[in-house]
Amino acid sequence: MTYLPVALTIAGTDPSGGAGIMADLKSFQARDVYGMAVVTSLVAQNTRGVQLIEHVSTQMLEAQLESVFSDIKPQAVKTGMLATTEIMEIIQPYLKKMDCPYVLDPVMVATSGDTLIDTSARSYLKTNLLPLATIITPNLPEAEEIVGFSIHDPEVLRSEERRVGKECRSRWSPYH
């Protein structure tokens, strides 16, 4: 019997299906990967913007993580919208003890421009989750938030990419 590789997404929802766990699960399926999901936040949004965000309770978040990690061990984990420090503090121990690739998508702002993460969580992400990541997938505004300044020059972008890459736990990088 052949089993599919297993990946876990830990993120918020997007009822339009264009982002969040819905998009992650579609991507997993398109690549013949068995996808699992832990929901961090329920987001009411569409192409015009974010209407409402409600974070799951800490008890529910912990129960979802424990359910997944105590049974079907993921072979890769991707995080998306982790909107608060409290959410990140619950997730971090699971990320620290796993031995598989970790993709960090530092979701900070919706495509519509709406803020999706609070200020203290931005700092926590950079200090505590970034070093655990195998790879990070920021867009330009998120990359600028991570490095702390605007990036207008492609050479500066490559230089910062190298520097940040060295801070991650990546086993392979073109810059190592």
Question: Where in this protein do the model-derived segments appear?
Answer:
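A short acidic, helix-capping loop that chelates divalent metal ions and anchors anionic groups
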Residues: 43-51, 110-115, 143-147
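Glycine/small-residue-rich loop that forms an oxyanion/phosphate-binding "nest" at active or ligand-binding sites
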Residues: 74-128
